[in-house]
From Swiss-Prot:
Sites where the protein binds Ca(2+): E120, Q123
Identification of the protein by name: Non-structural glycoprotein 4
Record-level GO cellular component terms: extracellular region; host caveola; host cell rough endoplasmic reticulum membrane; membrane
Pfam families assigned to the protein according to its UniProt record, in alphabetical order: Rota_NSP4 (PF01452)
Family, per entry: Belongs to the rotavirus NSP4 family.
Post-translational modification: The N-glycosyl content is primarily Man(9)GlcNAc, with a small amount of Man(8)GlcNAc.
Cell compartments where the protein resides: Host rough endoplasmic reticulum membrane; Host membrane, Host caveola; Secreted
Topology with respect to the bilayer: Single-pass type III membrane protein
InterPro entries xrefs: Rotavirus_NSP4 (IPR002107)
UniProt free text on domains: Binds 1 calcium ion per tetramer.
Known glycosylation sites: N8
Keywords: Activation of host autophagy by virus, Calcium, Enterotoxin, Glycoprotein, Host endoplasmic reticulum, Host membrane, Host-virus interaction, Ion channel, Ion transport, Membrane, Metal-binding, Secreted, Signal-anchor, Toxin, Transmembrane, Transmembrane helix, Transport, Viral ion channel, Virulence
GO annotation, biological process: monoatomic ion transmembrane transport; symbiont-mediated activation of host autophagy; viral process
């Protein structure tokens, strides 16, 4: 059993070394290897998953035209991403969904701005009222002390004591 393991390990090492030596001498393949590997991976995945994806898409979409349109748009988007483009092709259905989502976000932002504006206006009004209360005017006389003094004297006064003094002489 150990001999079989060592044979497999040496075989893997030899294949690895042969592959690396081939790539070392071929500069073009080495330079574009990540790009070629990604293309081969996408092609292999599309080949393996093509039929099942087509069947599922046809049952969901309902018509063959929509399926073909979705597949073509997806392929173009994959190709554009491979070449480094940030833009993507969007179908009409997705475009309508994106537009409605954007409009909903704009409406939410407008509501938030209105609430914040209302709060700010209330705060400004409150600050103006506080300023008016704190502002001292010389022509106005503050009667609160006198009023409070009168009320204090009434409260301290004994209700059972006669209001005027009567002399007994």
């Amino acid at each position: 059993m150990e001999n079989a393991t060592t044979i497999n390990e040496t075989l893997v090492e030899e294949v690895y070394n042969m592959t690396m030596s081939y790539f070392e001498h071929n500069v073009i393949i080495m330079k574009y290897f990540p790009f070629l590997a990604s293309i081969l991976t996408i092609a292999f995945t599309a080949w393996k998953m093509g039929k099942s994806t087509f069947k599922v898409t046809k049952t969901v979409a309902g018509s063959g035209f929509k399926v073909v349109r979705v597949i073509v748009i997806t392929i173009f988007n994959c190709i554009m991403r491979l070449f480094g483009s940030k833009t993507e092709i969007v179908s009409d259905d997705r475009l309508d969904a994106l537009a409605s989502k954007i409009l909903a976000q704009i409406n939410n932002q407008v509501k938030v701005i209105e609430q914040l504006t209302k709060r700010e206006l209330e705060q400004v009004k409150l600050l103006a009222d506080i300023y008016e209360m704190l502002k001292f005017k010389k022509d106005e006389v503050d009667m609160s002390f006198e009023t409070n003094k009168k009320e204090y004297e009434k409260w301290v006064k004994d209700p059972y004591q006669p209001t005027r003094a009567v002399s007994l002489d």
